[in-house]
Amino acid sequence: VKRIAAHLVDRTNLNTNIRHVRRMNGGVMVNIEGQGEIWFDAVVLAAHADQSLALIQDASEDERDILSAFQFQTNLAVLHSDAKLMPKRRGAWAAWNYVSDSLPGQPRVANLGTAGPAVANDLCLTYWMTRLQSIDLAYPLYETLNPRTMPDEELIHGEFHYRHPVFDHKAIAAQPRLGKIQGKNGLFFAGAWTGFG
């Protein structure tokens, strides 16, 4: 991104709020807070599907139908160095380690009503970052989503809340249809929801 931005010095806006986008004169008009409207040949909306849809002032029926098929859940991610959130047997450690209380056939995601976000109700996932990122084993590093018990406080490096895509039947059915809207009338879509997360 930095290399591309270096060639666009006069056209790069960091930490800028976009109010909306709309198609106009074969391109895309972007309404930028504090700057008004600026016309572009094409625009990449690198955001969640629901956020992208909210930005498109003149969304087509296909855009509304496809983008609204994707739901998101809020997860707590904790970056830490506490091995107690990994499997007890070291031989069972993998790059991705999960714990779940649900029984076979039970859903792993609960929706807290139409006004609330979907949240993971019983799934705890720990990424072994040392292995995933080829970090020196002397510096153990893990990222745990929705920890059932928090890591020891002195071993926590940061806590973050993220919205992750929920790959339910509706979302998976919508993914192959992205080609119907990708690049149409100057708008492109990018994000974890367009692929495997």
Give the label of every model feature segment:
Residues T12-L14, L45, F189:
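A structural signal for the hydrophobic beta-strands that form the central parallel beta-sheet
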Residues K2:
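Active-site phosphate/pyrophosphate- and oxyanion-stabilizing loops and adjacent acidic/basic residues
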Residues T149-G197:
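C-terminal catalytic lobe of FAD-dependent flavoproteins
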